[in-house]
UniProtKB/Swiss-Prot annotation:
Keyword Endoplasmic reticulum included in the entry's annotation: yes
Organism of derivation: Gallus gallus (Chicken)
GO BP annotations, alphabetical order: phosphatidylinositol biosynthetic process
Recorded domain comment: The C-terminal domain (residues 523-782) mediates pentameric interactions and is necessary for the formation and maintenance of the PI(3,5)P2 regulatory complex.
Full protein name: Protein VAC14 homolog
Keywords: Endoplasmic reticulum, Endosome, Membrane, Microsome, Repeat
InterPro entries according to UniProt: ARM-like (IPR011989), ARM-type_fold (IPR016024), Vac14 (IPR026825), VAC14_Fig4p-bd (IPR021841)
Domain of life: Eukaryota
Subcellular location: Endosome membrane; Microsome membrane
Lineage: Eukaryota, Metazoa, Chordata, Craniata, Vertebrata
Subunit structure: Forms pentamers. Component of the PI(3,5)P2 regulatory complex/PAS complex, at least composed of PIKFYVE, FIG4 and VAC14. VAC14 nucleates the assembly of the complex and serves as a scaffold by pentamerizing into a star-shaped structure, which can bind a single copy each of PIKFYVE and FIG4 and coordinates their activities. Interacts with NOS1.
GO cellular component: a single term: endosome membrane
Function of the molecule: Scaffold protein component of the PI(3,5)P2 regulatory complex which regulates both the synthesis and turnover of phosphatidylinositol 3,5-bisphosphate (PtdIns(3,5)P2). Pentamerizes into a star-shaped structure and nucleates the assembly of the complex. The pentamer binds a single copy each of PIKFYVE and FIG4 and coordinates both PIKfyve kinase activity and FIG4 phosphatase activity, being required to maintain normal levels of phosphatidylinositol 3-phosphate (PtdIns(3)P) and phosphatidylinositol 5-phosphate (PtdIns(5)P).
Biased composition (Low complexity): 365-377
Length: 780
């Protein structure tokens, strides 16, 4: 009985009914409690109201006995109904015990708790919003409840709460975000569905700006996007689409920088939907935020570049990644080359930044993920920022180069990715050459190795980068000279090309020391030529399969004369004589047959200028590594007497199958259009006796082969000199009309030829283990 007095003002019959196992009796007791509380409200007796709620909470709802807990729940709901609009004054006391019952092991009790809370919330309406977080927390747990009745009850309560939030303007979003951020990482499907449904509701409320807090929940949203449930994935897609729609409508208020790294992470996701969605977001971010995204370029490239090599199964991702890559590349501007110096300026913070936003892209009217569309790209941020903020948006070139270098070293990456990496390097050397040359020494080796790539497209793009490095004015500085080219060089007096005054003033002494043969290129040009030849020497297969292709492309990208001049210069000092001979043969074939070298051939054919004569001498000294190519060079330059003198010396050489094969090829070449002028000169027998002698010399060297027959037939067509007397007898040949040719010391050139061939003979003997070779001479 003492217990009954302790529970006053509740009557003993009410107490007994609340503890009864039958629902009907508990319901009758609840009606009595409702009546009692109404009387207290009418009397304005708040203390008694609080006392009743306390009793129902402590003695019933939180009781150890399940039936008592059920009675307490229905009693608290009855109190709320009786209080009506005044229930807001007691919500904390009413809600807390009910929420505690959400964790009860008995599913029936959890259901009654849902029912009770529904009645409490229905009465209180907007007054429950200050308690929204605890209600949301409780509901998020019930959303994953295994009992279907409990889940159904929680959904009913959930809809009611959403209606209240939608119609109210008092929702505390700031207080709710931490809880949402925590709950969004739940792995339970039902909890995720619950979270997404609430995000969609909050997005739809005009007075709630959830976009401001998107950085807090974006990562969680992308994780939910990978859920196994198609329904949840679809809901998440819709939510992300709505956010993207809002971002496009009002980009100036979006915190792009805070979300950039989140997108970078999910652009690398294994799940296709997550990756595609993140990539679409990245595309929009780059195009809307512009240069605000530059500090995150290295991360973006890490995510985007591998996607460029995807096959058709991931075509959508590949296309969007390509747009991202192109858009990001356009953000790099020449001013980035000066940014470091600008930041170091003391007065810069007080000065306006010269970079002004170009234009604001028109906001898209839909938030759907457009895979193939490429909206207009802006080279500047659409966000309205102060000058000091713009100064901080700088290009992290070190990070970008590190990523590009890493991808070039990775042999597993696809062809399109390698091409994109090389395009980036080329673009950076064009836009920010001064900064890029700080990285050239580290990039140079991998760029050279890339010349061995299987793809012609990769090699072409690689050559463009190397050519830009070799020709950029930024490379001709005191700080960036290659060490290899600074070595003393034998024969420098003879091989040195005259330097124009303008080039002297621009290049400086450092540049001349590094590359005396190539004054129009920078200090890296000569280094490039040295290392390219080293590459060919160590990789003979590369020389055989791609050597001509590489050199011909370089002739399109760089000065042809400089390429041949420098390579001949380097080969002059080559210790591997067999390689030198092979390389000279390759260069000679290119010189005589490639359309890219038409102008250089014309220049050498006439030898009218000091530069052309100097080039001839330089080429000749290296061409001596290969006797037949030396003769062909003399034919090209119309030095027929010297060609004859050389052929006379062939009798002292070791005649091998390779040697005869080269003579055979030279005969075939003489029949080609390139030597049309030479064949026409055979008509002028009187003025070209040494041409005819030289050709007869080749004929005598050849065995009775098809080439022998070809040359023999050609020589049979040479007219009788006496028959040609009716022609202008005073006419001199082209070679005899060149007064400048007398400035070339042909005797010294012949001596040089003898020295080089003696070295070759010595090396061959050493290889064969022969001490001596008997002299053999062909008398012509």
């Amino acid at each position: 009985m003492n217990a009954e007095r302790d529970l006053a003002p509740l009557a003993p019959s009410v107490v007994r009914a609340l503890n009864d196992k039958l629902y009907e009796k508990r319901k009758v007791a609840a009606l009595e409690i409702e009546k009692l509380v109404r009387e207290f409200v009418a009397q304005n007796n708040t203390s008694q109201v609080k006392h009743v709620i306390l009793i129902l909470s402590q003695e019933f709802a939180l009781s150890q006995h399940p039936h008592s807990r059920k009675g307490g729940l229905i009693g608290l709901a009855a109190c709320s109904i009786a209080l009506g609009k005044d229930s807001g004054l007691y919500l904390k006391e009413l809600i807390e015990p009910v929420l505690t019952c959400f964790n009860d092991a008995d599913s029936r009790l959890r259901y009654y708790a849902c029912e009770a809370l529904y009645n409490i919330v229905k009465v209180a309406r907007g007054s429950v919003l200050p308690h929204f977080n605890v209600l949301f927390d409780g509901l998020s747990k019930l959303a994953a409840d295994p009992d279907p009745n409990v889940k159904s009850g929680s959904e009913l309560l959930d809809r009611l709460l959403k209606d209240i939030v939608t119609e109210s303007n008092q929702f505390d979003l700031v207080g709710f975000i931490p809880l949402l951020r925590e709950r969004i990482y739940s792995n339970n499907q039902y909890a995720r569905q619950f979270i997404i449904s609430w995000i969609l509701v909050l997005e739809s409320v005009p007075d709630i700006n959830l976009l401001d807090y998107l950085p807090e929940i974006l990562d969680g949203l992308f994780q939910i996007l990978g859920d196994n449930s198609k329904e949840i994935r679809k809901m998440c897609e819709v939510a992300l689409g709505e956010f993207l729609k809002e971002i496009k409508k009002n980009p100036s208020s979006v915190k792009f920088a805070e979300m950039a790294n989140i997108l970078v992470i999910h652009c690398q996701a294994a799940d296709d939907l997550i990756q595609l969605t993140a990539m679409c977001w990245m595309r929009e971010f780059i195009q809307l935020a512009g240069r605000v995204m530059l500090p995150y370029s290295s991360g973006i490239l890490t995510a985007v570049l591998p996607c460029l090599s995807y096959d058709d199964r991931k075509k959508n991702i590949k296309e969007v990644a390509n747009v991202c890559n192109q858009s990001l590349m356009k953000l790099v501007i020449p001013e980035d080359d000066e940014m470091d110096e600008a930041k170091q300026s003391i007065t810069l913070s007080a000065e306006p930044n010269p970079e002004e936003p170009v234009s604001k892209p028109e906001a898209a009217s839909t938030g759907s993920l457009d895979v193939s569309g490429d909206s207009s790209v802006s080279n500047a941020s659409v966000c309205t920022v102060t000058s000091s903020e713009r100064i901080q948006v700088t290009l992290n070139l070190d990070g970008i180069v590190q990523v590009l270098d890493c991808h070039l070293h990775d042999t597993s990456i696809g062809m399109m990715t390698r091409i994109a990496v090389l395009k980036w390097l080329y673009h950076l050397y064009i836009k920010t050459p001064r900064k890029m040359f700080r990285h050239t020494d580290s990039l140079f080796p991998i760029l050279l190795r890339t010349l061995s790539d299987e793809s012609d497209e990769v090699i072409l793009k690689d050559l463009e980068v190397l050519a830009e490095i070799a020709s950029s004015p930024a490379g001709q500085t005191e700080g960036y000279g290659p060490s290899e080219a600074a070595e003393p060089r034998p024969g420098q007096v003879e091989l040195h090309v005259p330097i124009r005054n303008s080039q002297l003033s621009s290049s400086g002494p450092k540049g001349l020391e590094c590359s005396p043969s190539t004054p129009t290129m920078n200090s890296y040009f000569y280094k490039f030529m040295i290392n390219l030849l080293k590459r060919f020497s160590s990789e003979r297969k590369l020389l055989e399969t791609r050597g001509a292709f590489i050199i011909r492309q370089l002739c399109l990208l760089l000065n042809t004369e400089n390429i041949f001049h420098s390579m001949a210069d380097i080969l002059l000092r080559e210790e591997d004589l067999k390689f030198a001979s092979t390389m000279v043969h390759t260069l000679n074939t290119i010189l005589l047959t490639s359309s890219e070298l038409f102008q250089l051939r014309n220049q050498l054919k006439d030898l009218r200028t000091p530069e052309s004569r100097n080039l001839f001498c330089c080429l000749y000294r290296s061409w001596c590594h290969n006797p037949v190519t030396t003769v062909s060079l003399c034919f090209l330059t119309q030095n027929y007497k010297h060609a004859y003198d050389l052929i006379q010396k062939f009798g002292d050489l070791e005649v091998t199958v390779d040697f005869l094969t080269e003579v055979d090829k030279l005969v075939q070449l003489i029949e080609c259009p390139i030597f049309t002028y030479l064949r026409l000169q055979l008509l002028d027998v009187k003025n070209n006796p040494y041409l005819i002698k030289a050709l007869y010399g080749l004929l005598m060297l050849l065995p009775q082969s098809s080439a022998f027959q070809l040359l023999s037939h050609r020589l049979q067509c040479v007219p009788n000199p006496e028959l040609m007397q009716s022609a202008d007898g005073s006419r001199a040949s082209a070679s005899s009309r060149r007064p400048a040719s007398s400035t070339i010391d042909y005797t010294e050139l012949l001596q040089h030829f003898d020295k080089v061939q003696s070295k070759h003979l010595e090396v061959r003997h050493q290889r064969a283990g022969r001490a001596e070779q008997p002299e053999r001479r062909v008398v012509l």
